[in-house]
């Protein structure tokens, strides 16, 4: 799984060298942010049901046409699948926070997702709206510390940009 540490080691190994000073500074920065990432991961895990519900609700409020006949959310079963997808991506964001890299989203979330959504007539913009809502509803210090919020929002930004 890709993280700052594994990427640094892989690059050094591929070049047949030891990690450079700048490589080690990058790893050190990643380690220094670990406590904030783990705080964000813990808060997300303990509140994930509410986060997923609010994010999904925001999606369907913004894109109410999705519940029209023939659209992606025209039955309760399809609506439930959308919430399931939001939950899946939020778990991947949690995993990214834990490992300190984007590997979980890259490897398990993005590869082929846009093509699948197009084939199933599921607009990625609706998912993007869900994740933007989850990012924007964050309130520091109510939900987590400022640094944990930066880590959380940064991972959601990465996911949003990957889905666009």
UniProtKB/Swiss-Prot annotation:
State which residue ranges cross the membrane: none
Q: Which GO terms describe its cellular component?
A: chloroplast thylakoid membrane; phycobilisome
**Mind listing the GO biological process terms from this record?**
photosynthesis
Pfam families referenced in this protein's UniProt entry, alphabetically: Phycobilisome
InterPro entries (UniProt xref) = Globin-like_sf (IPR009050), Phycobilisome_asu/bsu (IPR012128), Phycobilisome_asu/bsu_sf (IPR038719)
Q: What is its main location?
A: plastid
Q: Which residues bind (2R,3E)-phycoerythrobilin 2?
A: 139
Topology in the membrane? Peripheral membrane protein
The reply on keyword Transferase is: no
Keywords carried by this UniProt record: Antenna complex, Bile pigment, Chloroplast, Chromophore, Electron transport, Membrane, Photosynthesis, Phycobilisome, Plastid, Thylakoid, Transport
Location within or outside the cell: Plastid, Chloroplast thylakoid membrane
Q: How is it modified after translation?
A: Contains two covalently linked bilin chromophores.
Positions of (2R,3E)-phycoerythrobilin 1 binding: 82
What the protein does? Light-harvesting photosynthetic bile pigment-protein from the phycobiliprotein complex.
Q: How does it assemble?
A: Heterodimer of an alpha and a beta chain.
Q: Name the family.
A: Belongs to the phycobiliprotein family.
What name has this protein been given in UniProt?
Answer: R-phycoerythrin alpha chain
State the organism of origin: Pyropia haitanensis
Q: What is the lineage of its organism?
A: Eukaryota, Rhodophyta, Bangiophyceae, Bangiales, Bangiaceae
| GN (gene name) | cpeA
């Amino acid at each position: 799984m890709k993280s700052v540490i594994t990427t640094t080691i892989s690059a050094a190994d591929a070049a047949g060298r030891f990690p450079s000073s700048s490589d080690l500074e990058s790893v050190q920065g990643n380690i220094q942010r670990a406590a904030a990432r783990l705080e964000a991961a813990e808060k997300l895990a303990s509140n994930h049901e509410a986060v997923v519900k609010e994010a999904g609700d925001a999606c369907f409020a913004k894109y109410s046409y999705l519940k029209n006949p023939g659209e992606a959310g025209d039955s309760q079963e399809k609506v439930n699948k959308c919430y399931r997808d939001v939950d899946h991506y939020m778990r991947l964001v949690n995993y990214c926070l834990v490992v300190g890299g984007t590997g979980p989203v890259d490897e398990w979330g993005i590869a082929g997702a846009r093509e699948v959504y197009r084939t199933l007539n599921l607009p990625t913009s609706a998912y993007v709206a869900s994740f933007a809502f989850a990012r924007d509803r964050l309130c520091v210090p109510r939900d987590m510390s400022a640094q944990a919020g930066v880590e959380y929002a940064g991972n959601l930004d990465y996911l949003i940009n990957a889905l666009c």
